[in-house]
Amino acid sequence: LHEVAIVPPQRHVRASDAAFLLGRLEDESNGGTDVALRWYDRYLVEAPDGAYASEALGRKMMTLRRNGQLAEASEIAADYLRRFPTGTYAHAARPLLRSR
């Protein structure tokens, strides 16, 4: 008989957390590259309600804005305010909506 490895749910949480942290590291060290955006997207897919969801979405919005992708940043701002109306990045999201 073969043993079946059972992966505890925490392991998956750690993997998604790592995706967020890698995005943040890339964002802070390289000024918001597409690589950072891909890590944030991966985190948001894997853990849409995770501990870092608000920060990942907010950082994605700010990175897009810094990159001049204002239409995309505005879409993320609307999503951010719907999900996290009093979140850390709400103050940055509101002007992006007004600029639509």
Question: How would you label these PLM feature ranges?
Answer:
Residues 17-20, 31, 54-55, 59:
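Repeat-based scaffolding regions
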Residues 20-27, 64-65, 98-99:
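Specific register positions within alpha-helical solenoid repeats of the TPR/Sel1-like families, i.e.
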Residues 32-33, 70:
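TPR-repeat structural position
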Residues 25-26, 46, 63, 83:
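Residue-level signature for tetratricopeptide repeat
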Residues 4-14, 43-53, 81-93:
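Short solvent-exposed coil/turn linkers within tandem alpha-helical repeat scaffolds
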Residues 1-2, 40, 77:
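Hydrophobic/aromatic packing residues within the alpha-helices of TPR/SEL1-like helical repeat arrays
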